[in-house]
């Protein structure tokens, strides 16, 4: 790679230290552009015709992200990463959830035909969209920046997006054995999806993640369980912890996004997943 970030090697060293629990990373969630000298003469695309083009047109997004990264600050440990997110928890859309583009985000609504079967359809348009978006961005990047892994998410959060949060919470009581089986099915599909997307975006063994603009020398992912604010510690240990543990065992570099103080009671006193 010949990226637009002149101090990338230094940042990589700091990331490797950070993954080994040493030092800090001076980064930010997104990029800023005020006062930035462009890294390349990349023109902005024509404004999106509508929200569908803004989010779900791979070529338009690739052109926009190419312009965006070229005009963004890459100082300190800010990484050159194209944010390819298709909404938080887009694995749910791959499994049948319904996309809706908003002004500032992408919403994923439950599958109206969901019947408790977790099925991966390799011909599903939302899965094809993920791959086409990443391929378009990778071609446009031309080695100048990383193409970030979308925020697939996992486990109960994916099922809640696919089925509805209230129904998943009832399942912890009404059909816990079925729920456990669904968690394993989602995990199995997660690894298949993750590996295929990783092979599209990887730079050697390296990759970047779209959220947190984070980097690792191998496979990495951000893990979380937002719904955990609404379940007991026993349910967390049964329906969340085993499957996050499996992700940590199979993915080289992982970080846990503790989204809200309500989820902290699952972590206090537990140093290891």
Regions flagged by a language model, labelled:
Residues 1-51, 62-63, 68, 72-84, ...:
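Active-site loop segments of alpha/beta catalytic cores
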Residues 81-116:
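A contiguous, low-structure linker/loop signature
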């Amino acid at each position: 790679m010949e990226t637009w970030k002149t101090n990338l090697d230094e940042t990589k060293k700091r990331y490797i230290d950070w993954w080994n629990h040493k030092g800090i990373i001076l980064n930010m969630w997104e990029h800023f552009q005020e006062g930035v000298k462009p890294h390349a003469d990349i023109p902005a695309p024509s404004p999106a015709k509508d929200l569908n083009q803004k989010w779900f047109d791979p070529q338009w997004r690739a052109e926009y992200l190419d312009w965006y990264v070229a005009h963004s600050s890459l100082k300190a440990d800010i990484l050159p990463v194209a944010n390819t997110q298709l909404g938080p928890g887009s694995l749910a859309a791959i499994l049948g959830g319904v996309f809706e583009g908003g002004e500032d985000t992408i919403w994923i609504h439950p599958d109206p035909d969901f019947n408790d079967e977790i099925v991966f359809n390799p011909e599903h348009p939302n899965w094809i969209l993920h791959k086409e978006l990443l391929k378009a961005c990778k071609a446009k990047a031309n080695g100048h920046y990383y193409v970030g892994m979308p925020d697939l998410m996992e486990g109960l959060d994916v099922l809640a997006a696919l089925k509805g949060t209230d129904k998943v919470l009832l399942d912890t009581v009404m059909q816990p054995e079925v729920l456990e089986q669904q968690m394993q099915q989602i995990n199995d599909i997660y690894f298949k999806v993750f590996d295929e997307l990783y092979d599209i975006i990887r730079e050697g063994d390296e990759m970047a993640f779209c959220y947190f603009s984070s980097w690792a020398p191998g496979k990495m992912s951000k893990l979380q369980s937002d719904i955990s604010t609404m379940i007991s510690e026993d349910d967390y240990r049964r329906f969340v912890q085993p499957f996050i543990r499996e992700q940590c065992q199979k993915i080289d570099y992982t970080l846990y996004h503790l989204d809200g103080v309500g989820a902290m009671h699952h972590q206090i006193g537990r140093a290891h997943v």
